[in-house]
Amino acid sequence: MDVMQVVGKSEAEASVLLGQPASCADIHRARLCKYGPHEDEVMFVRDKASMITVQGMDAVAFGADALDALGLATAEPDSADEHAIRWQSIPGLHEVAVFPGPGNSVDFAYIDVGKH
């Protein structure tokens, strides 16, 4: 998923890019929708895509190059350990984090726009 195409989009705009959601639920002051075969999650705050969880990344190696699979340029992480690799210096995003899965792959990625 090219996350920058989805960031800041409305639910209707995200559906054009990702297809119709498999499900949506209202959670507090936000709306959480799941898209595609991996049930990638997009949380809409004030009708803008503010948080994205990308699933189904098991073909991606757990490392700084994982940003490529998200449509982002490779960058030096701000922190990295065996539990997560985090970037807080990507323009337009508050944080990008990838979490390890089995066999040194990425389990999932979390993207926070930070403008709630």
Language-model segments: which ranges?
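A cross-family detector of function-defining hotspots
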Residues: 9-116
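Short N-terminal segments immediately surrounding and downstream of signal-peptide cleavage
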Residues: 1-9
